[in-house]
Structure formats: C-alpha cells, structure tokens
C-alpha cells in the first residue's frame, strides 16, 4: 500500500525588478533583508535599498555624497547588531554603511594594524551580532560597532607566522 500527498500552493505573485524599474543595475550579487524591513542589494554599481515601493541608490551618480567613495561591485552584505551594514566588494575591500546618516566608511585603517594584507576574503555575523572578518593572510578578526558606528576590533587568530609569503598559503593547517 502506497500513500501519496499532493500539496497545492496559493497563487503567488513574483515581481521582477530591473534597472528600468529603479534597481541601480541588473547585476545583483547579494541581497539582505535588514532589521529595518528594507531589502538591500549589492549590485555591480553599488548599494541599493528597496522599501517595498521604490529603490534608492547610494552612489555618486544619483547625487548621493559620502566622505568615502561609495563601494562598487559589492559581493556580500551583512548587518551587525546595531544596524550597520558591512559591505565586502569583489576587490576585497571592506566598508561600513551607516543607514541613519547615509554614509560610508572605508574600514582600511581599522584592519591594517591587525593584518599585513588587508584584503578581506570573508565576512560573517556572529550569533551575538558582531562581525567576523577573514583577511587574505588568514588573520581572523572580530569587529564590533557601538551605537555611533565606532569600530572596535579584536584579533582572534594571527596566521602571519604560519603563512608562506610567496603564495599566501598556510604552512600548517591552523584552522
């Protein structure tokens, strides 16, 4: 005796958004639904938000201005516990976006004291809302922002002594 189940799904509406409908670029590398209810898109041309009705681009082409140049070619976006967006680009740079003030901060100076090679390979949030950063030289950092966006970093692992400087591979398996 065999049993079979059939499930019916209600009619679903799927919307397609393109550059013609307000998205900054048709190439979307990543998305994030923020705590604020906005959907954030990492596109080839930069950061874009969607509030459910309209898009907003955060780049210099649309009259947006930030002290630091807005990132382009975004590969990954994560949100920390204070609502700041951490943005990793394809060229392995890292930015912090303050949604309240609509401004970017290049995180170069914050990372360089912990790593000789400040290229960021991976970003990920922790369960408590901090952000883990893995650099190209395999250093692991834990980053935290306060309510005003001030960044504090702690080095969890320094692989520099274990990295072959000629090909950036680990000499020993330290992870």
Task: Identify the residue ranges that each predicted region occupies.
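Carboxylate-rich, polar loop motifs that coordinate divalent cations or form catalytic acidic clusters
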Residues: 1-175
